[in-house]
């Protein structure tokens, strides 16, 4: 579990410690993306390159030299634990004068399996990170966001084959974000859903050895399944993806639904102008 927090002052003296601050927090929750080459790492670098002071959190066993060597601060925290995030909030609040202008929820674990072959315990674990993690972050950090009249950015995803449960976590995040947007508007906080196309990260690494059950009805598709879980996406890079997200987040008013990443344009077009059953014959 990883979280990045970024802040700068409104008067351009970034990280100056003045009274008028614009602060950004980017949680990268239980994801490889804050490791080198991932989305979280790219976001931290992009905000850093914009002159922000960046705070990140990782699990105790995770290396952080690639962040701290660049002046990016690092905390140890597990964002599935209330106590860890409460402590994190107090630590960040003490450094940012109690306000935060953007919280980016980038849930990141994946469980690849056909819907009818799913191990529900794995799905519960994934929901704990991908859905309940962002909920916990917003619940605990909302006073800082309201004080700053800030933004909440939820990193979502397009649908993909063999990912019914992962798709469900992202659908939950999208719809929760839609309701959250309505509820936070009177409090002066914007909510942005980022709908991500495929990005070249190692999120599938934990699934590389996953196989279909021996008694699965999908055994004839074993080759296609293995190609899916072992592939290395060579499409949008984390750096390209991050740049587009950071540019959108830094706007005075961000788009409610922001599509970015490989194939996001064609998927968005298809969802708007074609029947929902368009993808039924994709396998």
Swiss-Prot record:
One of its GO terms (cellular component) is endoplasmic reticulum. One of its GO terms (biological process) is phosphatidic acid biosynthetic process. The active site is at residues 166, 170. Pathway: Secondary metabolite biosynthesis. GO terms for molecular function: acylglycerone-phosphate reductase (NADP+) activity; triacylglycerol lipase activity. Its EC number is 1.1.1.-. It comes from the Eukaryota. Keywords: NADP, Oxidoreductase. It holds the Pfam family adh_short. The keyword Electron transport does not apply. NADP(+) binds at residues 57, 78, 106, 166, 170, 199, 201. It is an enzyme of class 1 (oxidoreductase). Highly reducing polyketide synthase; part of the gene cluster that mediates the biosynthesis of annullatin D, an alkylated aromatic polyketide with a fused dihydrobenzofuran lactone ring system that exhibits potent agonistic activities toward the cannabinoid receptors. PANTHER family: NADPH-DEPENDENT 1-ACYLDIHYDROXYACETONE PHOSPHATE REDUCTASE, SHORT-CHAIN DEHYDROGENASE SRDE. Belongs to the short-chain dehydrogenases/reductases (SDR) family. This is Short-chain dehydrogenase anuB. It comes from Penicillium roqueforti (strain FM164). The lineage of its organism: Eukaryota, Fungi, Dikarya, Ascomycota, Pezizomycotina.
